[in-house]
């Protein structure tokens, strides 16, 4: 193996660099090349970068003593590579660098002596050595090929037949090769020289026709060198085949430095693609070579990404001896390109090639190709295609005769086989070709090539060879000029006597000179040669320039004239006779001056182009000056705008600072005002206790409720946890970034820890929560606090640690110090693993060998009754996931017992319980009143209801409570205080433990005795699924004390299971990434957060919402419409595509460039508190193409305040709800957003956020309606129909009222409070979220972010799982003990119907609606006579009772000041009239329970024809609404995606004219009413949280309509009828599961009573028959 030899060569300054007075930034000393950064101060460390190569050639100044010539470069590199080729190795030399760096000069050189490049010199030296060493035993043969790779297309430069692009293929034996690439045999250097010359001509013709440049294409010249040595003794001939690849790469430059545009830019992109791929290959090979150990999976090298690297695959890291010459520029203006070239060359040094001698390659290759051809023939025969035999190959070009049948199912396989067969036959035919045949084919191709040149008009010599640099002595001629100097003066066209026509090959008259390309006509022009005078005759519409002037009329050409034909063909005209005459007419001195004058400017392609621009009136210097002036003016203008914008921002920030300063001063004044009070101004503590006014007359139940509420809110710490997460996120990101950069393999992430039985805190973290571990003033046991910690995942050692936030900050200081010292460490520094084991590295901590699997708990209350129990308890980890099960036996050891243990381990111990041990460290999780602070999702009152139920004696069965074993007052005789008691704990088996753990053992102890633990022996975990048998017996003797008896009653024993990982230290098992039960939906946050209001330019940033008490809440339905201007001049709502799968549940389909308006309609129940006064502002902003948005977008200029039209109150016939509508003109172009100005691209959705600031009466602030809208913009004339077939066939888009989007909002009214109090300011504190703040090295984290609010929800679910597991374990123990004691002797077992009712109740209890829907009031009545005697009431008594009831209700609502103006009736009159419908507001169990039912009237109270002869009482006078200031809050409700029930119902609304069929959807806690199934817009909303659902026999008998139930809100009532009998229960269960369960339970009891009566009668009759038979 050998590495790639790399040489660097620097060229002299060119004219461009000299004109710009560039400085040399390259220095070479020996093999070291140094480059100086001109943009960095010279004395800094980054100013000079040094690189070491195999060779460094200084070719900058020929006057220097160390100047490197072409010969020196060849002797160092060319001769060595040529020797490798004679040794039988493959050889490759390629030049790399930017355009104009000297690559072509190094590889090809010039025609002058001592200026030849590597390619000509290596070819000349090759034949010199061949002629010197060739003998009869040793013969040589040389073949060459010349190809060009331009824009990933391969062209053959030696064979004119191959006009198209050649195909690059890959053969399993040959590797990548170019199909049909001609290989021509050569016998001497002159043959190679002629082929190179003719190849360059073909390259010139193609480049001129296609307007290409050779510097933008790759040229690959390949020499196939074969040595045949004949051994006379053995009469065997051996071969060595070498392939010499000489590559001239295209220039590597950046688009901005070359000024490339249009086609040139695309060409550069394609060329840079191949060069970029070459760079990737070099980098990948260098990385592979630098690795110490290879991975099992082969490293991927992207050879196939470009044709260049695919063809050079063997030369890059394969079977080849390779050399790279990096050509660089010395000028400072090319610093970036030069540095990039040096870095590529430095990477190429590390590439290792595995070159082998290619001996006898053809014989083996021919044999393997024959085998492959035979396999392909067999495959084609199997497909039914006849193929010719091997002896017929010479008669046919392909081996396929004709297919015997048409294309079958395996057509693709057949075509592939035919293609492979043809390619293999071509290869074997090429390999079997003799040397004489190759020479003959080479001669044929030469003749074809010369004929093609002659046909094109290119001059040829008398022997047929094309004229190269040869200049005729008599005949006028044209010589080509090319942008690439190497391709200039390669083509010569004779102008014969008479007429010489020039055009394309498509002309009707054959043209003498044929050109092709753009702007060349079929008959372009004619040259007339009369008496050595050449006249150019242009044809019509032909583009011709002579000396820069466009030619319209015939003109006589003078020698040296520049002729431009079309746009790309540039020539120089030369007339030898005319030049000779001019020299004879003038004197010698004048001739010398003329010659000097002619020689002064070099007539080349650049000269012709500049001349063309000048003659056309384009002054390059003036144009450049003008462009510079424009750039300078643009710079000044942009700088002025930037300064103006900066000044505006400065003023804005200064205004903010002044406002904050003013706020701070006001707060300080307020605090100083409070501090000015003296202690005498406040009430003394003894005054409060002595003054009767301060005494509270609470009952015991009220004091318990107050203590429960106090503890709940005392430990409610969601906000403080979030503040800790937000404030320390930046430290976590910095630690992770440093860990990645230092390759520590340690990850940091936030976690929440709570000190519970299953998850005790580590000692260092437990100290931080010690102050909370004490009883409060109500005597409650201590409760653990949840704290934020850092989970440290050590993937290197397979360990997990927990750090406090303080420890993270301390370790972070050490990490920063290590990061800064990393650059000073040498590569020979010891491995960090040593430091991680010794604790010297701040990233690592010491870790134990055994890891915790989980914990289990066993209660000991069975020892109070000396009975043994065998428990099967779950092994639970700290996350609340079950990791296995443990079987444990607990039994008392009495004096008369004596058990012999044959197997297992038996141990004894003695413990002493002190009186201090009676108080447990942990407060049990099943004490729900305190743990509920973690698992309470919102302010639900379920715990309060439980407490009330317990207080009233209905929560727990009295019989079960009295029979509970734990309620035993006195222990048995075996537990006498002062005596000793012995009990036995037997650890039997463990099951279900994962296979990742080995050597499992169990350790158990009492909760307060961690230092006195009992341990079993480790057991091997075979992972076969069999139980792990411990069989460990532990006898424990304890002196009986009161604390020990109390412990037996209330506390368990803790069992810890340990094990170590099988695959240590891989961390994939250490993380315990197993599938756990997901949390319920109610524990999760909404999927897409609702956007915050867009900041109003008029109101500015709104203050924080007040924390005062909510006085009233109202449900508001809002409709959003975007209207577009129709041809009739009206604004018509645009089409809306409705779908629950869309983020906004609706998509507006808009047209581009049409005037729009936004229309918003607000619908709600009429109430005195909510009266819309006016619309103040409508703001639209946050234009984006993702559903998520951020408040930072409010700072952009996209926020726009729309022009408003006056709002109006609508009067909808048949609907007495309040409708308020307003519109605003929306000119979307003012946002200056490309998303709104152009037509949306395919699959693109645009999102905006709008906020409407509305003014309400009696409100100090505006109410804000905020909504996210999604839209797609089509063309102006496009049809905006629905995009899905479902909406297309439903036809709902044709309904104009369906083209709106609805939103459900909750309007909360709070009392305006003073914001200056310290308590309010403390509650309004805001902690900056630092998770988005940038830290150094953040880009290495690949988008990782610290966890935030979701972590709190996940921890809630973990605590709830732990709570459930402990409750289940405790209850299982009690049930097992009851069964063991024989207490479960219930004579009436639970029936199937009762079980169904229990299941219904359980399911309802876990649903969110259970938390918010109050049950219908139940009145437990055992004897109706004891409450109210049966009697009939007259009309006056009934009216009096109704009046008292309403007064009581008014007094109840009077507590909420916003509702004290409630009218006598809770509903408003309707315009359509009222139906005679009443429903019961108090549910009754049966008609026999209550003879009199108080009814709520759903119709208007002033209606004369009241039902049942009742007379409506006179309406009470409406009190005047006092002027109060409220603070409104409008919050959008994220409707649940879960549909509990949907279908058609008959709906009778109060005040309605009759029954109407409506489509009803239940999404708890809301019921949505639609007009029909196809109606996508919600027309009405019912909030089940504030409604009562009634379904009773009294109601059915009253309305005399079957299958009905009612939903009554505080504003109106609905009577609903299902379409079938069986649907009533399903609808009730969807709306109120608890009510459905009660009804089903009631029906079940009724069905059981007749059955029990029948059974008793049968038993009585059978007993009577038995008695009579005995008698």
UniProtKB/Swiss-Prot annotation:
Monomer. InterPro entries: FHA_dom, Kinesin-like, Kinesin-like_KIF1-typ, Kinesin_assoc, Kinesin_motor_CS, Kinesin_motor_dom, Kinesin_motor_dom_sf, P-loop_NTPase. It comes from the Eukaryota. SUPFAM superfamilies: P-loop containing nucleoside triphosphate hydrolases (SSF52540), PH domain-like (SSF50729), SMAD/FHA domain (SSF49879). It comes from Drosophila pseudoobscura pseudoobscura. It is found in: Cytoplasm, Cytoskeleton. The lineage of its organism: Eukaryota, Metazoa, Ecdysozoa, Arthropoda, Hexapoda. ATP binds at residues 97-104. Residues 1538-1636 form the PH domain. Residues 395-413 have a biased composition (Polar residues). Its main location: cytoplasm. Residues 358-437, 577-674 form a coiled coil. Required for presynaptic maturation, has a role in axonal transport of dense-core vesicles carrying synaptic vesicle precursors, components required for the morphological transformation of axonal growth cones to mature boutons. This is Kinesin-like protein unc-104. The gene is unc-104.
